[in-house]
A protein has these predicted regions:
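Residue-identity detector for glycine
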Residues: 3, 9-13, 30
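Transmembrane alpha-helical segments and their membrane-interface loop/helix boundaries
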Residues: 18, 23-147, 265-475
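Helix-loop-helix units of permease transmembrane domains in multi-pass membrane transporters
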Residues: 36, 46, 165-203, 469, ...
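Selective transmembrane-helix segments that form parts of the transport pathway or gating/packing helices
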Residues: 50, 150, 154, 158-159, ...
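Long, hydrophobic alpha-helical segments
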Residues: 107-119, 147-173, 177
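Hydrophobic/aromatic residues in alpha-helical transmembrane segments
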Residues: 163-167, 253, 269-270, 465
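Membrane-interfacial helix-loop-helix connectors in multipass membrane proteins
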Residues: 215-240
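Hydrophobic alpha-helical transmembrane segments of polytopic membrane proteins
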Residues: 237-260, 457, 461-462
Length: 475
């Protein structure tokens, strides 16, 4: 009995050892097979003329656009410095908006929304002037499409198309040529083959994106007008990560299309149609829908609202204006009347600004609605995220305008001080204009939900490709 137990123990021990060795051998072989697939895919991509053409075009476009945009940024920065240094004591206050350094990579709305604004107790506009001209931002604020060539444009258009042309036949071409059937005949796991194709293709795409990013950074570093600090570098790193997620969406989309269609030409046609819809047609349709669903008041309606809001104070305003005009003509200074003149004009300016601010908020709601409709478009998500990280989106401008409004109240109080305590008025120094901005970390955290959506799109497409490929009849 003891001998039987010993023999049984030896058999079980031998079985466990053999099983362990087989598992290790399978994992080693599987690991070697996966490495071989990845290596083969990388070499195939690198030898492709499509990759070489796309890479060269990307490097040229990124280098040239970054250099040109730096020149534009340098001019705007010099205009800003000249304007702030030449400020003199005068009626009203001029406020200048500093250009964003990362507008060289992601122009966004930085240039379109103007650079300067002049305020006084008589005037508090809701738009800036400069660059595009006063009120030009109303026409450019929510335009969707290819408005400028920069790093973001190259990623959004050129690199995404390059990814499609590289990956559209990653599975279908092998199916058409019969090489996929031979691979399956050698007991190569389907999931491992698809995963190897995914890793190999993703490596090449990320390498191309990294080269493009390094070219842009190199141009910025070598240019004397650009100073890169740790905050800016962190933002650039965040933009690289978002660009990788964006390109990953089109790569996994190409994989699933390539597994569904056996003919590469059909797959390419489908992918190009999808690209045109999600990158061009759908974003512009979302803007048109938002304009139709959220109607904005016309200029005449705004003027009517202003008159109606100010109607209770119109009589007092007219009487004060008439008395103040007579005082000016008579050259007799009445401090109380002068202060009252400032009060009634500031009151009218503030009430009018309420109407203008409401109109501006409606514009913002329209933009947010268009963006929410367009969230299914990877390009809309990508633009929204990188503009927020670069500080060139509409929210940055809105923060600037909030700072302008706060500064207006300070300037109005200073104007009143002239007629109550002139000595204090002369000694009073207007505080430097400031407005709150988001740090790089705050911007990345704020855009995290949209970044997760891009990641989930890639996961969804890859899982779909895996499911289709596992059930595909290779023949």
């Amino acid at each position: 009995m003891d001998g039987f137990q010993d023999s049984l123990g030896q058999i079980c021990g031998s079985f466990v050892i053999c099983t362990h060795e087989l598992i290790i051998q399978y994992l080693v072989i599987g690991d070697l097979m996966l490495k071989a697939i990845i290596k083969r895919e990388i070499l195939e991509y690198l030898k492709s003329s499509k990759f070489l053409i796309g890479l060269c075009l990307t490097i040229i476009l990124v280098g040239m656009s970054t250099f040109i945009n730096i020149g534009d940024y340098q001019q705007r920065q010099q205009d800003y410095l000249d304007a702030t240094q030449n400020l003199q004591e005068q009626f009203g206050v001029k406020i200048f908006r500093k250009p964003q350094v990362l507008s060289t990579l992601v122009q966004g709305r930085d240039r379109e929304l103007g650079s300067q604004i002049e305020i006084s107790f008589l005037r508090l506009p809701i738009q800036t002037s400069g660059y595009m001209g006063e009120f030009a931002s109303q026409h450019h604020r929510y335009v969707s499409g290819f408005t400028s060539v920069d790093f973001a444009f190259v990623v959004r258009v050129v690199l995404s198309l390059m990814v499609i042309f590289l990956a559209y036949n990653s599975v279908s071409e092998e199916t058409a040529q019969g090489t996929l059937r031979l691979s399956m005949a050698n007991a190569l796991p389907r999931g491992q083959l698809l995963f190897g194709k995914f890793i190999g293709g993703l490596f090449v795409i990320l390498a191309c994106l990294t080269i493009a990013t390094l070219v842009a950074v190199l141009v910025m570093v070598l240019h004397p007008a650009i100073m890169l600090d740790s905050e800016t570098c962190l933002r650039i790193l965040g933009m690289w990560m978002i660009s990788a997620l964006y390109l990953g969406v089109f790569f996994t989309l190409s994989l699933i299309v390539s597994t569904i269609f056996n003919r590469p030409s059909i797959g390419l046609l489908v992918l190009l149609q999808v690209w045109i819809v999600v990158n061009v047609i759908y974003p512009n349709v979302s803007v048109i829908l938002s304009q139709q669903l959220i109607r904005l008041p016309g200029q005449e309606e705004l003027e009517d609202r202003k008159r109606a809001l100010f109607e209770p104070f119109q009589r007092q305003f007219s009487e004060t204006q008439e008395a103040f005009t007579k005082m000016v003509k008579s050259s007799d200074i009445d401090m109380e009347l002068s202060k009252k003149n400032v009060d009634v004009n500031a009151q009218r300016t503030e009430l009018y600004h309420r109407i203008d601010s409401e109109y501006s908020r409606q514009l913002t709601r329209q933009m947010h609605f268009a963006r929410n409709i367009g969230l299914l478009s990877p390009s809309v998500l990508y633009d929204s995220i990188v503009q927020r990280i670069a500080g060139t989106d509409i929210r940055e401008f809105d923060k600037f305008m909030e700072g302008v409004e706060r500064h207006w109240y300070k300037d109005t109080e200073r104007a009143k001080l002239m007629y109550t305590d002139y000595k204090a008025y002369q000694e009073y120094k207007m505080p430097e204009f400031t407005y709150s901005t988001q740090s790089a970390v705050e911007s990345l955290v704020y855009t995290l939900p949209e970044s997760i959506v891009l990641f989930l799109l890639s996961v969804f497409f890859f899982v779909g490709a895996h499911t289709v490929f596992m059930r595909k009849n290779i023949g």
